[in-house]
Each structure stands twice: as structure tokens, then as C-alpha cells.
């Protein structure tokens, strides 16, 4: 079985409480890692609210039948304000991984897979630019439930009656254009490749 990814609402329709539990776990991790700080929607002017990135919650149905949620930012708005060379990261291309694996397998080479849990959430955002993100509807409410003492008072109601929560990103969140750069810089400072003599 291949991993299948769903949007938040589709995952809740298909998996019910399993999806809700996965989302709650992800939001709790994001809160515990201090990935963002809540902002008072009433004090934000039109321009910062307009530039705020939309939040996206994905839920993956993994091969072991577990569900894994991932909170992302929709970084498309950032493309309008950044040059391509500002967002280029020295991370590996997915195609390169598969090509290398296709060569290594028949040659019986040793390989290793390394997973850095919450890798992006370990990297700080750049202080040069304030990045705001907005969480809407159920996601805003679930974030408030994850840590009511922190987020509840910042959940605002729009004129249409929808809940919104504006947050300032403090950590590199998946989906932001510079997140891979920040993550690579964060781990690159502590990682030293082992060389053979």
C-alpha cells in the first residue's frame, strides 16, 4: 500500500477520530516546539492580514495503517516578494534519491535512511522578515483547544462568523519558501560528514 494524503476535511470524513487525533498530536507538537506566537487580529492592519499565509493541514494514511498529520503554510504568496536565488536550498532532489537508489541496489551498496523528527521545527525563522500565517475554522479551534491558555483569546470571529487565528512564525514551517534553507543551515552547523581514509 502506498501512502495516501488527504486534506483535513477529507481525512475526517474518511477516518473520523483517527484523523482528529493525528491533527491534535501535530498541533500539540507545533505548540510544544514554539513554532509560532499568536497575534491579535484586531491590531493587525489590512496589509499584514492580506499577506498572511494560509495554513494547510494534511493527513497521511501510512503503510502501517497509522495516520500522520502535517501542518504546512501555503507559501505561494511569498513567491511574489522573493527572488528565486533567495529561496534556493542545497537539499537533495527527490529524483536524485531514486536514481541513486536504482544504482546502489544492484551493486549491493550500503545505504542508510535518516529521519530527523520535526526537522523544520528545529530551525528558527529569519528575523529579517515577519511571516504571518492564518488558521481558519476547525483548525483555529483545534489550536485553541491544544493550548487554551495561549491561543483562546486570540481566536477572532470574522464578519461571516468564521473563526480565525493569526500567528507569527518563529520556526521554519513546511511550505514556507525559505524553510529548507533555514533547516539546512541549522543542521549543517552541527552535522559533519564522516570521511573514510
What spans do the regions from the language model cover?
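Long, low-complexity, charge-biased intrinsically disordered regions
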Residues: 1-197
Amino acid at each position: 500500500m502506498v501512502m495516501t494524503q488527504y486534506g483535513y476535511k477529507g481525512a475526517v470524513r474518511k477516518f473520523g477520530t483517527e484523523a482528529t487525533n493525528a491533527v491534535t498530536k501535530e498541533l500539540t507538537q507545533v505548540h510544544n516546539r514554539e513554532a509560532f506566537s499568536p497575534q491579535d487580529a484586531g491590531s493587525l492592519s489590512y496589509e499584514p492580514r492580506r499577506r498572511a499565509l494560509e495554513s494547510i493541514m494534511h493527513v497521511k494514511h501510512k503503510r502501517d495503517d497509522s495516520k500522520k498529520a502535517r501542518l504546512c503554510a501555503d507559501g505561494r504568496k511569498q513567491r511574489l516578494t522573493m527572488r528565486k536565488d533567495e529561496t534556493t536550498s542545497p537539499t537533495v532532489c527527490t529524483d536524485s534519491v531514486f536514481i541513486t537508489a536504482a544504482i546502489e541496489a544492484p551493486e549491493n551498496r550500503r545505504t542508510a535512511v535518516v529521519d530527523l523528527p520535526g526537522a523544520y521545527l528545529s530551525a528558527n525563522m529569519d528575523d529579517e522578515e515577519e511571516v504571518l500565517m492564518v488558521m481558519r475554522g476547525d483548525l483555529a479551534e483545534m489550536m485553541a483547544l491544544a493550548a487554551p491558555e495561549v491561543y483562546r483569546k486570540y481566536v477572532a470571529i470574522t464578519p461571516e462568523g468564521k473563526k480565525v487565528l493569526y500567528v507569527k512564525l518563529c520556526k521554519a514551517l513546511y511550505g514556507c519558501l525559505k524553510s529548507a534553507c533555514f533547516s539546512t543551515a541549522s543542521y549543517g552547523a552541527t552535522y559533519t560528514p564522516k570521511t573514510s581514509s
